[in-house]
Amino acid sequence: MTSSVIHQAVIDAYRVLDTGEPLDRETALRLAALPGDAVLDLASLAHKVRLRYAGEAASLHACSIMNAKSGECGENCRFCAQSRHNSASIDVYDLAGEDAVLRQAEEAVDSGIPHFGIVTSGYGYLKITPEFNRILGMIDMLHRELPGLNVCASLGVLGEETSAALAAHGIAHYNINIQVAPSRYSDLIADTHTVVERIATVRLLRKHRIPVCCGGILGVGESMTERLEMIFALSELDVSVIPLNVLVPIDGTPLEGHRTADIADIVKTFAICRLVHPRTIIKFAAGRETVMKDFQGLLMLSGANGFLTGGYLTTRGREIDADRELGRQLESFTEG
Protein backbone atom coordinates (compact mmCIF):
# COMPACT_ATOMS: atom_id res chain seq x y z
CA MET A 1 0.00 0.00 0.00
CA THR A 2 1.18 3.50 -0.80
CA SER A 3 -0.30 6.83 0.09
CA SER A 4 -0.72 7.61 -3.62
CA VAL A 5 -3.24 4.74 -3.84
CA ILE A 6 -4.75 4.69 -0.35
CA HIS A 7 -5.13 7.73 1.89
CA GLN A 8 -2.53 7.82 4.66
CA ALA A 9 -5.18 8.04 7.38
CA VAL A 10 -6.68 4.75 6.18
CA ILE A 11 -3.23 3.14 6.11
CA ASP A 12 -2.60 4.29 9.68
CA ALA A 13 -5.98 2.89 10.75
CA TYR A 14 -4.96 -0.59 9.59
CA ARG A 15 -3.33 -1.05 12.98
CA VAL A 16 -6.85 -1.79 14.29
CA LEU A 17 -6.99 -4.80 11.98
CA ASP A 18 -3.50 -5.89 13.01
CA THR A 19 -3.95 -5.50 16.77
CA GLY A 20 -7.67 -5.45 17.56
CA GLU A 21 -7.09 -2.31 19.61
CA PRO A 22 -9.70 0.47 19.24
CA LEU A 23 -8.98 3.41 16.96
CA ASP A 24 -7.57 6.52 18.63
CA ARG A 25 -9.30 9.91 18.48
CA GLU A 26 -6.64 11.64 16.40
CA THR A 27 -6.84 9.08 13.60
CA ALA A 28 -10.63 9.08 13.83
CA LEU A 29 -10.63 12.83 13.19
CA ARG A 30 -8.44 12.33 10.14
CA LEU A 31 -10.75 9.63 8.82
CA ALA A 32 -13.77 11.87 9.35
CA ALA A 33 -12.19 14.37 6.94
CA LEU A 34 -11.56 11.81 4.18
CA PRO A 35 -12.58 12.86 0.66
CA GLY A 36 -15.31 10.90 -1.06
CA ASP A 37 -12.95 8.89 -3.24
CA ALA A 38 -11.30 7.39 -0.13
CA VAL A 39 -14.52 6.28 1.60
CA LEU A 40 -14.64 2.83 0.01
CA ASP A 41 -11.08 2.12 1.20
CA LEU A 42 -12.22 2.97 4.72
CA ALA A 43 -15.34 0.83 4.34
CA SER A 44 -13.21 -2.12 3.20
CA LEU A 45 -11.01 -1.83 6.27
CA ALA A 46 -14.03 -1.64 8.58
CA HIS A 47 -15.50 -4.76 6.98
CA LYS A 48 -12.24 -6.65 7.50
CA VAL A 49 -12.16 -5.58 11.17
CA ARG A 50 -15.75 -6.71 11.61
CA LEU A 51 -14.96 -10.14 10.12
CA ARG A 52 -11.86 -10.61 12.26
CA TYR A 53 -13.08 -9.34 15.61
CA ALA A 54 -16.89 -9.08 15.76
CA GLY A 55 -18.03 -12.69 15.94
CA GLU A 56 -18.74 -15.29 13.30
CA ALA A 57 -18.16 -13.92 9.84
CA ALA A 58 -21.55 -14.87 8.41
CA SER A 59 -23.50 -14.03 11.57
CA LEU A 60 -25.77 -10.99 11.52
CA HIS A 61 -27.55 -9.80 14.67
CA ALA A 62 -31.22 -9.45 13.66
CA CYS A 63 -33.93 -8.09 15.92
CA SER A 64 -37.56 -7.06 15.69
CA ILE A 65 -39.50 -4.67 17.93
CA MET A 66 -43.10 -3.99 18.93
CA ASN A 67 -44.44 -0.54 19.68
CA ALA A 68 -46.33 -1.74 22.75
CA LYS A 69 -47.41 1.72 23.94
CA SER A 70 -47.68 4.56 21.44
CA GLY A 71 -47.80 8.34 21.61
CA GLU A 72 -48.69 10.87 24.33
CA CYS A 73 -45.06 11.12 25.45
CA GLY A 74 -44.34 14.17 27.58
CA GLU A 75 -40.74 14.49 26.37
CA ASN A 76 -39.96 16.90 23.53
CA CYS A 77 -37.55 14.88 21.37
CA ARG A 78 -37.32 16.84 18.12
CA PHE A 79 -37.22 13.83 15.79
CA CYS A 80 -39.98 11.79 17.42
CA ALA A 81 -43.55 11.42 16.19
CA GLN A 82 -44.69 10.14 19.61
CA SER A 83 -44.07 13.37 21.52
CA ARG A 84 -47.22 15.29 22.43
CA HIS A 85 -45.17 18.46 21.89
CA ASN A 86 -45.22 17.57 18.18
CA SER A 87 -48.17 17.28 15.79
CA ALA A 88 -47.35 14.14 13.83
CA SER A 89 -50.24 11.92 12.83
CA ILE A 90 -49.76 8.54 14.53
CA ASP A 91 -51.79 5.87 16.26
CA VAL A 92 -52.06 6.53 20.00
CA TYR A 93 -52.79 3.68 22.41
CA ASP A 94 -52.07 2.50 25.93
CA LEU A 95 -49.99 -0.54 26.82
CA ALA A 96 -50.91 -3.52 24.66
CA GLY A 97 -52.21 -6.75 26.12
CA GLU A 98 -50.25 -9.97 26.44
CA ASP A 99 -52.09 -11.63 23.55
CA ALA A 100 -51.06 -8.87 21.12
CA VAL A 101 -47.45 -9.02 22.31
CA LEU A 102 -47.37 -12.80 21.97
CA ARG A 103 -48.76 -12.68 18.43
CA GLN A 104 -46.10 -10.26 17.28
CA ALA A 105 -43.32 -12.17 19.04
CA GLU A 106 -44.50 -15.39 17.40
CA GLU A 107 -44.24 -13.71 13.99
CA ALA A 108 -40.62 -12.84 14.77
CA VAL A 109 -39.82 -16.38 15.87
CA ASP A 110 -41.55 -17.89 12.83
CA SER A 111 -39.41 -15.62 10.64
CA GLY A 112 -36.20 -16.76 12.31
CA ILE A 113 -35.59 -13.53 14.25
CA PRO A 114 -33.93 -14.41 17.58
CA HIS A 115 -34.34 -11.05 19.36
CA PHE A 116 -37.68 -9.35 20.11
CA GLY A 117 -38.03 -6.01 21.87
CA ILE A 118 -40.96 -4.52 23.80
CA VAL A 119 -40.89 -0.73 23.33
CA THR A 120 -43.01 1.84 25.18
CA SER A 121 -43.37 5.59 24.76
CA GLY A 122 -42.76 7.94 27.67
CA TYR A 123 -40.01 9.14 29.97
CA GLY A 124 -39.50 5.77 31.63
CA TYR A 125 -39.98 4.00 34.95
CA LEU A 126 -37.94 5.13 37.93
CA LYS A 127 -40.09 3.03 40.28
CA ILE A 128 -42.13 -0.13 39.88
CA THR A 129 -45.68 0.84 38.91
CA PRO A 130 -48.72 -1.28 38.00
CA GLU A 131 -47.92 -0.67 34.32
CA PHE A 132 -44.30 -1.72 34.81
CA ASN A 133 -45.49 -4.88 36.55
CA ARG A 134 -47.61 -5.63 33.48
CA ILE A 135 -44.48 -5.36 31.34
CA LEU A 136 -42.65 -7.75 33.66
CA GLY A 137 -45.58 -10.12 33.19
CA MET A 138 -45.18 -9.86 29.41
CA ILE A 139 -41.50 -10.73 29.70
CA ASP A 140 -42.30 -13.78 31.83
CA MET A 141 -45.04 -14.83 29.40
CA LEU A 142 -42.69 -14.64 26.41
CA HIS A 143 -40.05 -16.69 28.21
CA ARG A 144 -42.71 -19.27 29.03
CA GLU A 145 -44.43 -19.42 25.63
CA LEU A 146 -41.40 -18.92 23.39
CA PRO A 147 -38.40 -20.52 25.09
CA GLY A 148 -35.17 -19.56 23.40
CA LEU A 149 -36.40 -16.14 22.30
CA ASN A 150 -34.17 -13.29 23.47
CA VAL A 151 -36.66 -10.91 25.08
CA CYS A 152 -35.48 -7.30 25.06
CA ALA A 153 -37.01 -3.98 26.12
CA SER A 154 -36.78 -0.24 25.56
CA LEU A 155 -38.81 1.51 28.25
CA GLY A 156 -36.98 4.79 28.76
CA VAL A 157 -35.11 5.99 31.83
CA LEU A 158 -34.91 3.51 34.71
CA GLY A 159 -34.22 3.61 38.42
CA GLU A 160 -32.48 1.18 40.75
CA GLU A 161 -35.49 -1.01 41.49
CA THR A 162 -36.76 -1.19 37.91
CA SER A 163 -33.29 -2.07 36.60
CA ALA A 164 -32.98 -4.80 39.22
CA ALA A 165 -36.44 -6.13 38.35
CA LEU A 166 -35.60 -6.43 34.66
CA ALA A 167 -32.45 -8.34 35.56
CA ALA A 168 -34.45 -10.68 37.80
CA HIS A 169 -36.91 -11.35 34.97
CA GLY A 170 -34.16 -12.31 32.52
CA ILE A 171 -34.17 -9.45 30.04
CA ALA A 172 -31.69 -10.20 27.24
CA HIS A 173 -30.84 -6.63 26.18
CA TYR A 174 -32.09 -3.19 27.14
CA ASN A 175 -32.10 -0.33 24.64
CA ILE A 176 -31.63 3.30 25.60
CA ASN A 177 -29.81 5.63 23.21
CA ILE A 178 -27.68 8.67 23.95
CA GLN A 179 -28.66 9.78 20.41
CA VAL A 180 -25.96 12.40 19.74
CA ALA A 181 -22.81 13.88 21.24
CA PRO A 182 -23.62 14.43 24.93
CA SER A 183 -22.58 18.08 24.60
CA ARG A 184 -25.34 18.65 22.00
CA TYR A 185 -28.19 16.60 23.48
CA SER A 186 -30.21 19.49 24.88
CA ASP A 187 -30.30 21.50 21.65
CA LEU A 188 -30.37 18.71 19.06
CA ILE A 189 -32.67 16.21 20.81
CA ALA A 190 -34.62 17.34 23.89
CA ASP A 191 -34.50 19.61 26.93
CA THR A 192 -37.31 18.04 29.01
CA HIS A 193 -34.76 15.53 30.28
CA THR A 194 -30.97 15.23 30.09
CA VAL A 195 -28.53 12.84 28.52
CA VAL A 196 -27.09 12.41 32.02
CA GLU A 197 -30.28 10.56 33.00
CA ARG A 198 -29.85 8.22 30.06
CA ILE A 199 -26.20 7.58 30.84
CA ALA A 200 -27.14 6.89 34.47
CA THR A 201 -29.63 4.29 33.23
CA VAL A 202 -26.91 2.58 31.17
CA ARG A 203 -24.70 2.40 34.24
CA LEU A 204 -27.51 0.98 36.38
CA LEU A 205 -28.17 -1.69 33.78
CA ARG A 206 -24.51 -2.64 33.65
CA LYS A 207 -24.44 -2.75 37.46
CA HIS A 208 -27.14 -5.41 37.21
CA ARG A 209 -25.29 -7.20 34.38
CA ILE A 210 -27.90 -6.45 31.73
CA PRO A 211 -26.35 -6.14 28.25
CA VAL A 212 -27.08 -2.67 26.89
CA CYS A 213 -28.04 -1.63 23.37
CA CYS A 214 -27.11 2.05 23.12
CA GLY A 215 -26.40 4.22 20.11
CA GLY A 216 -27.74 7.24 18.33
CA ILE A 217 -29.28 8.98 15.36
CA LEU A 218 -27.44 10.53 12.43
CA GLY A 219 -28.54 13.55 10.46
CA VAL A 220 -30.23 15.76 13.07
CA GLY A 221 -27.83 18.67 12.61
CA GLU A 222 -24.65 17.30 14.15
CA SER A 223 -21.19 17.65 12.62
CA MET A 224 -18.86 14.76 11.87
CA THR A 225 -16.73 15.79 14.84
CA GLU A 226 -19.80 15.60 17.07
CA ARG A 227 -20.58 12.15 15.73
CA LEU A 228 -17.12 11.11 16.88
CA GLU A 229 -17.90 12.53 20.32
CA MET A 230 -20.91 10.22 20.49
CA ILE A 231 -18.94 7.21 19.26
CA PHE A 232 -16.20 7.71 21.84
CA ALA A 233 -18.75 8.40 24.60
CA LEU A 234 -20.16 4.94 23.91
CA SER A 235 -16.68 3.50 24.50
CA GLU A 236 -16.91 4.62 28.12
CA LEU A 237 -20.28 2.91 28.71
CA ASP A 238 -19.43 -0.76 28.05
CA VAL A 239 -22.35 -1.35 25.68
CA SER A 240 -22.94 -4.64 23.86
CA VAL A 241 -24.86 -3.35 20.84
CA ILE A 242 -24.65 0.03 19.08
CA PRO A 243 -27.74 0.81 16.99
CA LEU A 244 -27.21 3.61 14.50
CA ASN A 245 -30.31 5.24 13.06
CA VAL A 246 -30.41 7.65 10.15
CA LEU A 247 -32.99 10.40 10.54
CA VAL A 248 -36.23 9.90 8.64
CA PRO A 249 -37.82 13.38 8.85
CA ILE A 250 -41.45 13.00 9.96
CA ASP A 251 -44.16 15.53 9.17
CA GLY A 252 -45.38 17.31 12.28
CA THR A 253 -42.03 17.22 14.08
CA PRO A 254 -39.48 20.06 14.30
CA LEU A 255 -37.30 18.12 11.84
CA GLU A 256 -40.01 17.94 9.18
CA GLY A 257 -38.37 18.62 5.82
CA HIS A 258 -34.88 18.40 7.32
CA ARG A 259 -32.19 17.66 4.75
CA THR A 260 -31.21 14.01 4.81
CA ALA A 261 -27.69 13.06 5.80
CA ASP A 262 -24.99 12.67 3.15
CA ILE A 263 -24.58 9.03 2.08
CA ALA A 264 -20.76 9.09 2.07
CA ASP A 265 -20.70 10.65 5.54
CA ILE A 266 -23.02 7.94 6.84
CA VAL A 267 -20.71 5.27 5.45
CA LYS A 268 -17.73 7.01 7.08
CA THR A 269 -19.58 7.16 10.39
CA PHE A 270 -20.42 3.45 10.40
CA ALA A 271 -16.87 2.53 9.40
CA ILE A 272 -15.25 4.72 12.05
CA CYS A 273 -17.65 3.35 14.65
CA ARG A 274 -16.48 -0.16 13.78
CA LEU A 275 -12.83 0.82 14.12
CA VAL A 276 -13.48 2.41 17.52
CA HIS A 277 -15.55 -0.63 18.58
CA PRO A 278 -13.88 -3.63 16.91
CA ARG A 279 -15.79 -6.29 18.87
CA THR A 280 -19.20 -4.69 19.40
CA ILE A 281 -22.40 -5.46 17.48
CA ILE A 282 -23.15 -2.41 15.31
CA LYS A 283 -26.75 -2.45 14.16
CA PHE A 284 -28.26 -0.47 11.29
CA ALA A 285 -31.76 0.57 12.35
CA ALA A 286 -34.01 3.31 10.95
CA GLY A 287 -33.27 4.93 7.61
CA ARG A 288 -32.18 1.86 5.69
CA GLU A 289 -34.98 1.94 3.15
CA THR A 290 -35.87 5.62 3.06
CA VAL A 291 -32.45 7.29 3.21
CA MET A 292 -29.83 4.71 2.23
CA LYS A 293 -32.08 2.97 -0.32
CA ASP A 294 -29.78 1.34 -2.88
CA PHE A 295 -26.78 1.86 -0.59
CA GLN A 296 -28.01 -0.08 2.46
CA GLY A 297 -26.02 -3.15 1.44
CA LEU A 298 -22.90 -0.97 1.38
CA LEU A 299 -23.41 -0.11 5.06
CA MET A 300 -23.57 -3.80 5.87
CA LEU A 301 -20.13 -4.03 4.23
CA SER A 302 -18.80 -0.99 6.13
CA GLY A 303 -18.59 -2.53 9.58
CA ALA A 304 -22.23 -3.13 10.51
CA ASN A 305 -23.15 -6.65 11.59
CA GLY A 306 -26.76 -6.29 12.66
CA PHE A 307 -30.06 -4.77 11.64
CA LEU A 308 -33.52 -4.01 12.91
CA THR A 309 -36.09 -5.67 10.69
CA GLY A 310 -39.84 -5.74 10.17
CA GLY A 311 -40.70 -2.12 10.99
CA TYR A 312 -39.87 0.66 13.43
CA LEU A 313 -41.98 2.50 15.99
CA THR A 314 -44.00 4.84 13.79
CA THR A 315 -42.53 4.19 10.32
CA ARG A 316 -42.53 1.09 8.16
CA GLY A 317 -39.40 -0.96 7.68
CA ARG A 318 -38.40 -3.71 5.28
CA GLU A 319 -40.17 -7.03 5.14
CA ILE A 320 -38.35 -9.68 7.16
CA ASP A 321 -38.12 -11.99 4.13
CA ALA A 322 -36.35 -9.26 2.16
CA ASP A 323 -33.84 -8.77 4.97
CA ARG A 324 -33.26 -12.50 5.23
CA GLU A 325 -32.42 -12.55 1.52
CA LEU A 326 -30.10 -9.56 1.98
CA GLY A 327 -28.28 -11.43 4.72
CA ARG A 328 -27.90 -14.47 2.48
CA GLN A 329 -26.48 -12.34 -0.33
CA LEU A 330 -24.01 -10.67 2.02
CA GLU A 331 -22.56 -14.04 3.01
CA SER A 332 -20.50 -14.12 -0.19
CA PHE A 333 -18.54 -11.14 1.17
CA THR A 334 -17.55 -13.08 4.30
CA GLU A 335 -15.80 -15.99 2.62
CA GLY A 336 -12.05 -15.91 2.97
Curated annotation (Swiss-Prot):
CDD domains per record: Radical_SAM
One Pfam family cited in the UniProt record for this chain: BATS
Biological processes annotated in GO: biotin biosynthetic process
Keyword DNA repair among UniProt keywords: no
Class of enzymatic activity (EC top level): transferase
EC number, UniProt record: 2.8.1.6
Cofactor(s) the record lists: [4Fe-4S] cluster; [2Fe-2S] cluster
Subunit structure: Homodimer.
Function: Catalyzes the conversion of dethiobiotin (DTB) to biotin by the insertion of a sulfur atom into dethiobiotin via a radical-based mechanism.
Family: Belongs to the radical SAM superfamily. Biotin synthase family.
Protein name: Biotin synthase
Natural source organism: Chlorobium limicola (strain DSM 245 / NBRC 103803 / 6330)
Gene label: bioB
